[in-house]
């Protein structure tokens, strides 16, 4: 019995390598690549292409002739190119002189910069050695808070009463008439009233 084999058509990819499936009707290309191919052909037909085949045929038809006389000519050409590539001694001397001049300029600039930095360091050290008045004031010890009664020398701590005369008193001697306070309450009150209640005077009548 004859065995029948069903050959299923395997889908092939586009011949341009775009990743889509191609069609044998469009020369193995997808529809997009086939349209681009047709557009390129139409545009190339409008332009005059150079006869590349004729050039290649002429190059193949002409044999390369190499004679003994052509070898020395090539050797002389190589010698001339090598001699042109070698640097001239004049150019080397000029480069050396320029490098020496640049190094001298750098050394002089460094020498100028060194004394400037020394002056700056000296000024900074002078200012650091002279303490300012504010620092000296801040270093002073703060005054100890009085914690004893000025009259009976009883230790009051936080329960003491500070009077306007500047002393601290206990609960018994806190009144001004008890400890003979030197603060003038009357003058202070009169000054306060004078500031809060200024005298209002009307304008003088100008005679015609």
Swiss-Prot record:
<feature type="modified residue" description="N6-acetyllysine">
    <location>
        <position position="204"/>
    </location>
</feature>
<dbReference type="GO" id="GO:0003677">
    <property type="term" value="F:DNA binding"/>
</dbReference>
<feature type="modified residue" description="Phosphoserine">
    <location>
        <position position="49"/>
    </location>
</feature>
<feature type="compositionally biased region" description="Polar residues">
    <location>
        <begin position="120"/>
        <end position="133"/>
    </location>
</feature>
<keyword id="KW-0653">Protein transport</keyword>
<feature type="compositionally biased region" description="Polar residues">
    <location>
        <begin position="95"/>
        <end position="110"/>
    </location>
</feature>
<dbReference type="GO" id="GO:0008270">
    <property type="term" value="F:zinc ion binding"/>
</dbReference>
<dbReference type="GO" id="GO:0006625">
    <property type="term" value="P:protein targeting to peroxisome"/>
</dbReference>
<dbReference type="GO" id="GO:0015031">
    <property type="term" value="P:protein transport"/>
</dbReference>
<dbReference type="InterPro" id="IPR000058">
    <property type="entry name" value="Znf_AN1"/>
</dbReference>
<feature type="binding site">
    <location>
        <position position="163"/>
    </location>
    <ligand>
        <name>Zn(2+) 3</name>
    </ligand>
</feature>
<keyword id="KW-0813">Transport</keyword>
<dbReference type="GO" id="GO:0043122">
    <property type="term" value="P:regulation of canonical NF-kappaB signal transduction"/>
</dbReference>
<keyword id="KW-0053">Apoptosis</keyword>
<feature type="binding site">
    <location>
        <position position="152"/>
    </location>
    <ligand>
        <name>Zn(2+) 2</name>
    </ligand>
</feature>
<dbReference type="GO" id="GO:0071356">
    <property type="term" value="P:cellular response to tumor necrosis factor"/>
</dbReference>
<dbReference type="InterPro" id="IPR050652">
    <property type="entry name" value="AN1_A20_ZnFinger"/>
</dbReference>
<dbReference type="Pfam" id="PF01754">
    <property type="entry name" value="zf-A20"/>
</dbReference>
<feature type="binding site">
    <location>
        <position position="149"/>
    </location>
    <ligand>
        <name>Zn(2+) 2</name>
    </ligand>
</feature>
<dbReference type="Pfam" id="PF01428">
    <property type="entry name" value="zf-AN1"/>
</dbReference>
<keyword id="KW-0007">Acetylation</keyword>
<feature type="compositionally biased region" description="Low complexity">
    <location>
        <begin position="80"/>
        <end position="94"/>
    </location>
</feature>
<comment type="subunit">
    <text>Interacts with PKN1. Interacts with TRAF2. Interacts with mono- and polyubiquitin. Interacts with PEX6. Interacts with PEX5 (Cys-linked ubiquitinated).</text>
</comment>
<protein>
    <recommendedName>
        <fullName>AN1-type zinc finger protein 6</fullName>
    </recommendedName>
</protein>
<keyword id="KW-0963">Cytoplasm</keyword>
<feature type="binding site">
    <location>
        <position position="18"/>
    </location>
    <ligand>
        <name>Zn(2+) 1</name>
    </ligand>
</feature>
<feature type="zinc finger region" description="A20-type">
    <location>
        <begin position="8"/>
        <end position="42"/>
    </location>
</feature>
<comment type="function">
    <text>Involved in regulation of TNF-alpha induced NF-kappa-B activation and apoptosis. Involved in modulation of 'Lys-48'-linked polyubiquitination status of TRAF2 and decreases association of TRAF2 with RIPK1. Required for PTS1 target sequence-dependent protein import into peroxisomes and PEX5 stability; may cooperate with PEX6. In vitro involved in PEX5 export from the cytosol to peroxisomes.</text>
</comment>
<feature type="binding site">
    <location>
        <position position="179"/>
    </location>
    <ligand>
        <name>Zn(2+) 3</name>
    </ligand>
</feature>
<feature type="binding site">
    <location>
        <position position="14"/>
    </location>
    <ligand>
        <name>Zn(2+) 1</name>
    </ligand>
</feature>
<feature type="region of interest" description="Disordered">
    <location>
        <begin position="41"/>
        <end position="140"/>
    </location>
</feature>
<dbReference type="GO" id="GO:0006915">
    <property type="term" value="P:apoptotic process"/>
</dbReference>
<keyword id="KW-0597">Phosphoprotein</keyword>
<feature type="binding site">
    <location>
        <position position="33"/>
    </location>
    <ligand>
        <name>Zn(2+) 1</name>
    </ligand>
</feature>
<feature type="binding site">
    <location>
        <position position="173"/>
    </location>
    <ligand>
        <name>Zn(2+) 2</name>
    </ligand>
</feature>
<dbReference type="InterPro" id="IPR002653">
    <property type="entry name" value="Znf_A20"/>
</dbReference>
<feature type="zinc finger region" description="AN1-type">
    <location>
        <begin position="143"/>
        <end position="189"/>
    </location>
</feature>
<feature type="compositionally biased region" description="Polar residues">
    <location>
        <begin position="41"/>
        <end position="68"/>
    </location>
</feature>
<feature type="binding site">
    <location>
        <position position="165"/>
    </location>
    <ligand>
        <name>Zn(2+) 3</name>
    </ligand>
</feature>
<dbReference type="GO" id="GO:0005829">
    <property type="term" value="C:cytosol"/>
</dbReference>
<keyword id="KW-0479">Metal-binding</keyword>
<dbReference type="InterPro" id="IPR035896">
    <property type="entry name" value="AN1-like_Znf"/>
</dbReference>
């Amino acid at each position: 019995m004859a065995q029948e084999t069903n050959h299923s058509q395997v889908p092939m990819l586009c011949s341009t390598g775009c990743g889509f499936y191609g069609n044998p009707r469009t020369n193995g290309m997808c529809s997009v690549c086939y349209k681009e191919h047709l557009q390129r052909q139409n545009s190339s037909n409008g332009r005059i292409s150079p006869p590349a085949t004729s050039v290649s045929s002429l190059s193949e038809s002409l044999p390369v002739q190499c004679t003994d006389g052509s070898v020395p000519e090539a050797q002389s050409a190589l010698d001339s190119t090598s001699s042109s590539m070698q640097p001239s001694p004049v150019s080397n001397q000029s480069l050396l002189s320029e490098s020496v001049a640049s190094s001298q300029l750098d050394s002089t600039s460094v020498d100028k910069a060194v004394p400037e930095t020394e002056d700056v360091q000296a000024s900074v050290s002078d200012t650091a050695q002279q303490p300012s008045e504010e620092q000296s004031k801040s270093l002073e010890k703060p005054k100890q808070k009085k914690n004893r009664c000025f009259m009976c020398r009883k230790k009051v701590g936080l329960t003491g009463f500070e009077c306007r005369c500047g002393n601290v008193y206990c609960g018994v001697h806190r009144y001004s008439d008890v400890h003979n306070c030197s603060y003038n309450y009357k003058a202070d009150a009169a000054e306060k009233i004078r500031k809060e209640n200024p005298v209002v005077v009307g304008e003088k009548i100008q005679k015609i």
